[in-house]
Design a protein with these regions (language model features):
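Short N-terminal segments immediately surrounding and downstream of signal-peptide cleavage
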Residues: 28-49
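Juxtamembrane cytosolic interface motif at the C-terminal end of transmembrane helices
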Residues: 23-27
């Protein structure tokens, strides 16, 4: 015979235990942390998409092009972002490739390998950022360039850094005769000439 009272108590206990696990995982983070991390992840998605779209539009033969001696070539611009992403992720506690500074950005000019490395670096940063607590975000760290700042500030600084190199990539693309895909789409949607 079905015992409704026993069933209801079991169901109630299961729900309480489940809620305890969910609430416990968020108890270490404030609502502000969840908002910051969510916003940060959204910004990472945006910049990753722009960088990968621009890289995809660039021809392979322009990957080794550099505007002047001693200036990063096209592939190095994207790989520099990837290397910086790994630096950021390491400060977040992620397991990242152990390399000398500057090694990743000079590792290849193969467009497919550049794209793969860039994607992997964003994945590592997103996974690490998604698990941060208030305490971790507010922790003072020493950056690779010798400055002390909170992890939160370092994350924002490296987001700015990504945008800086997106701008550099846009210039390289334009000089190479490549229209950034999102600009071309906006211009064609508004009956512009795509330039």
């Amino acid at each position: 015979m079905f015992n409704f009272k026993k069933f209801a108590l079991t169901l109630f206990a299961t729900v309480l235990l489940s809620l305890g696990v969910v609430i416990g995982s968020y108890a270490k983070s404030s609502p502000d942390t969840l908002v910051f991390v969510g916003d940060y992840l959204g910004q990472l998605d945006f910049i990753e998409g722009r960088l990968l779209d621009l890289l995809d539009a660039m021809p392979q033969e322009r990957m080794a092009w550099e505007p002047a001696d001693g200036v990063r070539n096209t592939a190095e611009v994207y790989l520099h972002v990837a290397e910086s992403n790994y630096s950021l992720a390491s400060k977040m506690g992620a397991d990242v490739p152990k390399t000398e500074r500057g090694t990743i950005e000079k590792s290849t000019t193969d467009k497919e390998k550049v794209a793969e490395t860039l994607k992997e670096s964003f994945t590592v940063v997103k996974e690490a950022a998604g698990n941060l607590t208030d305490e971790e975000l507010n922790k003072i760290i020493q950056t690779p360039f010798g400055m002390d700042m909170s992890l939160r500030n370092f994350m924002i600084s490296l987001l700015n850094h990504m945008h800086e190199h997106l701008g550099q990539g846009i210039v390289y693309a334009r000089v190479s005769g490549v229209i950034p895909p999102w600009s071309d789409k906006q211009d064609s949607d508004s009956d512009g000439d795509g330039k």
